[in-house]
Amino acid sequence: MINEKSIGFDFPEGILGFENIKKFIIKDSKYKPFSIMQSINKEVSFLVTSPFNFLSEYLPNIQEKDWSDIKAKEEDERVILCIINMHVNDYKDITANLKAPIIINKKKLLGKQAICTNEKYSLHHKVFKE
């Protein structure tokens, strides 16, 4: 993932629903394997993780234009994260947004939210199977 304890990223297009927020930091969480993606002004934060932590065969088919938008030409620059949804009434009912992953260029410190073209992924993929 991203090795540093806390690192800042520019999101020129913002995040869907939060287009006006352009700067985020990603920092370690005490709840591994999750990290916290927090806006610099601390108004908004998301719980994120690598989708490969719970779905090793994840193939989102991210468009090359999306990677180009954040200047991530090489594989070693690219990181894929997903936003996690925790449901208050049932902590085992944790879902991940696999339909709109966060993509990061970890060298240029740029990010965006992409739309996955693989139809088998949803906005609410169950992280823990029963």
From Swiss-Prot:
Primary residence: cytoplasm
GO biological process, one term: bacterial-type flagellum assembly
Function: Acts as an anti-CsrA protein, binds CsrA and prevents it from repressing translation of its target genes, one of which is flagellin. Binds to flagellin and participates in the assembly of the flagellum.
Complexes and interactors: Interacts with translational regulator CsrA and flagellin(s).
Name of the protein described by the UniProt record: Flagellar assembly factor FliW
Family named by the database record: Belongs to the FliW family.
Record localization: Cytoplasm
PANTHER family recorded: FLAGELLAR ASSEMBLY FACTOR FLIW (PTHR39190:SF1)
UniProt GO cellular component terms: cytoplasm
Signal peptide: none
HAMAP family in the cross-refs: FliW
Organism: Borrelia garinii subsp. bavariensis (strain ATCC BAA-2496 / DSM 23469 / PBi)
Keywords in alphabetical order: Bacterial flagellum biogenesis, Chaperone, Cytoplasm, Translation regulation
